[in-house]
Design a protein with these regions (language model features):
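Exposed, interaction-prone regions of secreted/extracellular proteins
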Residues: 1-123
């Protein structure tokens, strides 16, 4: 992942996070390429219990991806169940929330999609 250069406007990406239980290794992928891994023996006998899809910024002053007119869309969201394949996220309206509703918007589109945006871009 090229953290120095944000993705181009309108670009499409696939991000994935997976646990290899046999090795206790989490791998984070950007468009199919592992860009960071984390290994700890703890994960050989434990599973992740919570899945979160987050539109995140580094500093509070940074702009969140998207604007009210051009929202940033997370689509086809799924999670992998231990010993099985991927299943749809199953988002409810209550799942779409913002830490600061005066700054950042979030709306549920479907059970597998939501939009985020900065309510005050460039400020």
């Amino acid at each position: 992942m090229n953290t120095a250069n944000a993705p181009a406007e309108g670009s499409v990406h696939e991000w994935k996070c997976e646990l290899d239980k046999a090795n206790g290794k989490w791998s984070y992928y950007d468009n199919g390429t592992a860009w960071i891994t984390y290994t700890d023996n703890f994960w050989k006998s434990h599973l992740g219990q919570v899945v979160q899809w987050v539109g995140e910024i580094l500093n509070k002053e940074d702009d969140m991806p998207g604007t009210s007119g051009e929202k940033c869309s997370f689509t086809e969201c799924q999670c992998k169940v231990d010993g099985a394949g991927y299943v749809d996220a199953g988002f409810s309206a209550a799942d779409a929330k913002s830490d600061d509703g005066s700054e950042w918007g979030c709306e549920r589109v479907s059970g597998t999609a939501f939009n985020i945006w900065d309510k005050n871009p460039n400020t």
